[in-house]
Amino acid sequence: MSMQPELKVQRTPPKGGFHAWHREHGVGEISHRILVWTIYLNDIPQGEGETEFLEYGMKVQPKKGTVCFFPAGFTHTHRGNAVYTHDKYIATGWYYLA
């Protein structure tokens, strides 16, 4: 396993988010991803900006300093729910099967 050398930092403005259900493992350049990590860089009010997992009905509320690890495959299809009142900041990356 190896860690992606780049750190991806994202800003999500109010009403933004990655609303489509997706997974981090697929074809092409993402085909070797096996584990995802996300660090929440700021607090977001309850009910906004959660990382939601389809199969589990589970939502992770963004709280500054919290790290979320999950498998990249179909078992953890997820989305980023909209934020309404604040910008949301995350750092994210992947572990690859090299």
Where are these regions (language model features)?
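Structural recognition of the beta-strand scaffold that forms the well-ordered cores
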Residues: K8-R11, A20, C68-F70
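A short coil-to-beta-strand element that immediately follows conserved catalytic motifs
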Residues: M1-L7, G47
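Short beta-strand or tight-loop elements
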Residues: P5, G17-H19, R33, H76
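Histidine-centered catalytic micro-motifs
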Residues: F18-G26
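A short beta-turn/loop motif at secondary-structure boundaries
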Residues: M1, R11, V83-T85
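Short, conserved beta-strand element in jelly-roll/cupin
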Residues: V9-P14, V27-Q46
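Extracellular/lumenal carbohydrate-interaction signature centered on repeated Trp-anchored short motifs
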Residues: M1, G28-I30, Q61
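Catalytic core of Fe(II)/2-oxoglutarate
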Residues: H32-R33, Q46-A98
